[in-house]
Amino acid sequence: MIKIRNLEKQDIPSAEYICLITAAREIKDTPKKALRTLLMYNRCYTRTQKSSSFVAENESGRVVGYILCAESLPKYLKSFFGMELQEIFKTGFISGIASFFEAVSPAVFSIKYPAHLHIDILPEYQGQKVGTALMSALKEKLISDNIKGVMLCTGKDNVQAVEFYKKNGFKVIFKLFGAVFMGLNLPQS
């Protein structure tokens, strides 16, 4: 039985492990790339967004997936620029510039979709409704906090992920090169 609960400090190593295990090979195949992946997709969320982030825990207490969410992308970016982006620049100037543009690219949609999420599930737990349970917990939290929409970005070749997001109510809002931006409007209380 999978239990969904809020992310806690002791979950951060597991979340980082899952982030790297599920990342595409080309963004983790060197120590610098692996560090950039953690800084880009994990560490700012786990450092600043614990109240709107959740983990899935199996029956033995192992974290097998997570959903990380910033309820306000502009506030998140301010934190990201203040710490994680600076660390990325230390790994290489080109990597820093690319990361800056990747981080700000969803901002154009943040008026309609102020929240931004990142989700990863260990491969052996995919297809077992773990992602749907995490998504449900996040939607409930965002609705209770009166957040009007949430967005994400995924790769256009990640067909399985795009279908998962569509099944969970997301719609494609924009495509750019290899990226697909998806958004979900949430009911207001």
Walk through the language-model features, giving the residues of each:
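A short beta-loop-alpha structural element at the N-terminal edge
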Residues: I2-Y17
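Helix-loop element at the rim of GNAT/NAT acetyltransferase active sites that forms part
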Residues: Y17-K32, C44-Y45
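Active-site rim helix/loop that mediates acceptor-substrate recognition in acyltransferases
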Residues: P31-S53, E59
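Conserved beta-strand in the GNAT
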Residues: V55, R62-E71
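Conserved acyl-donor/pantetheine-binding loop and adjacent beta-alpha core of acyl/acetyltransferases
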Residues: L73-H118
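Conserved GNAT acetyl-CoA-binding A-motif
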Residues: K112-A115, L142-T154
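Conserved acetyl-CoA-binding loop-helix of GNAT-fold acetyltransferases
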Residues: H118, G127-K141, E163, K167
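C-terminal "cap" of GNAT-fold acetyltransferases
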Residues: K148-V162, K167-S189
